[in-house]
Swiss-Prot record:
It is a single-pass type II membrane protein; Lipid-anchor; GPI-anchor. The gene is Bst2. This is Bone marrow stromal antigen 2. The extracellular coiled coil domain forms an extended 170 A long semi-flexible rod-like structure important for virion retention at the cell surface and prevention of virus spreading. Residues 153-172 form a propeptide. The lineage of its organism: Eukaryota, Metazoa, Chordata, Craniata, Vertebrata. Keywords: Cell membrane, Coiled coil, Cytoplasm, Disulfide bond, Endosome, Glycoprotein, Golgi apparatus, GPI-anchor, Immunity, Innate immunity, Isopeptide bond, Lipoprotein, Membrane, Signal-anchor, Transmembrane, Transmembrane helix, Ubl conjugation. It comes from Rattus norvegicus. Pfam families: BST2 (PF16716).
């Protein structure tokens, strides 16, 4: 035995190195239990979410999501076609509007030309009427002068004959 004058009591070596409170084995046991509990919780959650993912509601949701995606794609395609059709229709409308404007301008020019031609025709008709009147006057004057000449021509002939007869009488 050791001398009695040491100030501490003799302690066995294996007790000396162990920490006070819980031992390392207990810590490992607690850690293992926690890992197993966490694993069980994770497995339960995976099973729960796997069942939820394969449930009818989830399948219906996925099917509806696919239908919505397809419908959205179809609607986008139809919208694109409608926009293209609208653009083409607007271009045709602009072309038609331009054609209408050109035709309106052309019509205004034609109306103006027609009015000018009608005014010219009216002027020429008036001139023709005036010339016809003058022609009628000249015909009337010619008839009068012809009648006068015929009348005066007959008296000239008669007077010429009388003079001739008188000269012949006087001469013989």
């Amino acid at each position: 035995m050791a001398p009695s004058f040491y100030h501490y009591l003799p302690v066995a070596m294996d007790e000396r190195w162990e920490p006070k409170g819980w031992s390392i084995r207990r810590w490992w046991l607690v850690a293992a239990i926690l890992v197993v509990l966490i694993g069980v919780v994770l497995v339960c959650l995976i099973v729960y979410f796997a069942n939820a993912a394969h449930s009818e509601a989830c399948k219906n949701g996925l099917r509806l999501q696919d239908e919505c995606r397809n419908t959205t794609h179809l609607l986008k395609h139809q919208l694109t076609r409608a926009q293209d059709s609208l653009l083409q229709t607007e271009m045709q409308a602009n072309s038609c509007n331009q054609t209408v404007m050109d035709l309106r301008d052309s019509l205004k020019k034609k109306v103006s030309q027609t009015q000018e031609q009608q005014a010219r025709i009216k002027e020429l008709e008036n001139k023709i009427e005036r010339l016809n009147q003058e022609l009628e006057n000249l015909r009337t004057q010619k008839e009068i002068s012809t009648t006068v000449q015929v009348n005066s021509g007959g008296s000239v002939v008669v007077s010429s004959l009388l003079v001739l007869v008188a000269v012949l009488f006087l001469h013989f």
